[in-house]
């Protein structure tokens, strides 16, 4: 469950980072319509991805930001790296919130869905716990938080059944990531 969901989290972070960076640059330089700046940063991101195989990410984003700075600092000035940092922090926060909302929706939908007979909820379970990427860990954290929060009005969700996988070298021993 966590591996495929992490791919969606990566895409969300990339989109939010680029959008937030375009907004930050627009606000700083007094550009009223940020869509042109956004399109420019989308092109820059595409060029960096093609040439270097780098993307904005929750982990080790420094190399991507350095390449982006090389391209954009001439046009946007030395304060550009500060704007990158702000956009990164905001994108991480917004990605975390979007991930929580997605997990909340999953739990809500699984507990309000009826079977074809209309009398029961379909049995569902999810397996997670071995993805050590920041995106995978964000998925795991937020699915557990959404489960803990419940369905509202004090109602505890019955589904999905959570199966947390334990693996040596991943999450079994105290020193594992």
Language-model regions, residue ranges each:
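Conserved catalytic cores of very large enzyme subunits
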Residues: 1-177
């Amino acid at each position: 469950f966590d591996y495929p969901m992490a791919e969606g989290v990566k895409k969300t972070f990339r989109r939010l980072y680029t959008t937030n960076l375009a907004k930050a640059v627009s606000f700083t330089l007094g550009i009223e319509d940020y869509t042109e700046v956004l399109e420019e940063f989308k092109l820059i991101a595409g060029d960096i991805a093609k040439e270097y195989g780098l993307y904005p990410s929750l982990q080790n984003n420094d190399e991507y930001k350095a390449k982006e700075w090389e391209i954009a600092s001439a046009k946007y000035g030395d304060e550009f790296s500060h704007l990158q940092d702000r956009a990164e922090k905001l994108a991480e926060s917004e990605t975390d919130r979007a991930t929580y909302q997605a997990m909340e929706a999953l739990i809500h939908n699984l507990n309000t869905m009826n079977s074809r007979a209309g009398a029961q909820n379909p049995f569902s379970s999810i397996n997670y716990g071995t993805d050590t990427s920041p995106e995978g860990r964000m998925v795991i954290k937020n699915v557990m938080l959404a489960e803990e929060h419940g369905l509202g009005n004090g109602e505890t969700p019955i589904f999905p059944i959570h199966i947390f996988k334990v693996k040596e070298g991943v999450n079994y021993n105290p020193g594992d990531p």
